[in-house]
Design a protein with these regions (language model features):
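C-terminal partner/receptor-binding element of secreted or periplasmic proteins
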Residues: 84-121
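Extracytoplasmic/periplasmic/luminal assembly and interaction segments
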Residues: 47-90
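Residues at the start of alpha-helices and the adjacent loop-to-helix junctions
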Residues: 1-4, 37, 50
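Short, aromatic- and cysteine-enriched interfacial helices/patches
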Residues: 1, 24-25, 117, 121
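Hydrophobic membrane-insertion alpha-helices, especially the h-region
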Residues: 2-23
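Short, non-transmembrane alpha-helical segments in secretory-pathway proteins
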Residues: 20-46
Length: 121
């Protein structure tokens, strides 16, 4: 096999791996973004790994973003903006979006944002 074939094959493998990683990273917040859309917002969500936990910040076109903490397959509200999104979603229903993640306010184990998340606000 020629060196050019090996280089092209290697570049293709790296490209496929990067695309899969981007897809997996995006799918982590896709359900959360759809929940915001069902609540009537046009979000822009990003995830952060802080203190061994997965956090999501979803900008909805107002001051501070909605902050969420992933706990198992659900997302706990991290601030009042996120609580407002959850309440609005509960009132409006899922609309055309199916399989939305469970959103909740954790009253037993309150969400405390680490410094890295606070710095993004």
């Amino acid at each position: 096999m020629k060196k050019t074939h090996l280089v092209i094959g290697g570049a293709a493998a790296i490209g496929i791996g990067a695309a899969l990683l981007a897809d997996l990273t995006g799918s982590q917040t896709q359900g959360l973004a759809n929940a915001h859309k069902a609540a009537g917002y046009e979000p822009s969500c990003e995830t952060l790994q802080e203190a061994g936990e997965t956090w999501a910040l979803c900008s909805i076109g107002r001051g501070a973003p909605a902050v969420w903490l992933q706990r198992a397959e659900a997302w706990a509200t991290g601030n009042g903006v996120a609580q407002g999104v959850a309440q609005r979603l509960e009132a409006r229903g899922p609309g055309p979006y199916q399989s939305l993640p469970r959103l909740y306010v954790d009253r037993e184990k309150p969400v405390i944002m680490p410094a890295g998340v606070l710095a993004k606000l």
